[in-house]
Amino acid sequence: APDIIHATTWAIPPTSKPLAITVHDVAFLRDPDHFTAHGTAYFHRALEITRKRADAIIVPSQATADDCVEAGLDASLITVIPHGLSHTPVTDDQIEDFRARWDLTRPYILWVGTREPRKNLPTLLAAYRQMEDADLDLVLVGPAGWGSDPTDAPLAPDRVHVLGRLDDADLACAYAGA
């Protein structure tokens, strides 16, 4: 049997064991309109469970630690441990193959995330439109989320590439090729 349970997300299991919880952010408190009502309620319940039951709280940054303290979590339980990094070596041939498969012939700006309101994609797209003279494409990687998807609107098809979710190998190539 485990000596400790580590909940790496807000999906906190019931347990009588010591409990460590990773809190990636508390954005639902700062920008509740960027979440569904169901999502906001879920996160509030998880925050309350964290407040009552956590024996240790892991956060990725000092900013998140400060937000957690402001949200009522015990500062003495919080430890900052930055998110890890996975270095996947990518060859020039792999990048060339990736770019050819996705018809990426020009240099590009890469955005990776879930396409949903809290990611503020409309602002990125508006900024990109102001760069129309730049010889840069915009590559959007990641799945559609909830709410309106700004990529449903007409985009410059030869300059804005919506790739959707990529496997790890292609994602590494997308980063390396940007």
Regions found by a protein language model. Name each.
Residues A1-A178:
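Carbohydrate transferase catalytic cores enriched for Leloir-type hexosyltransferases
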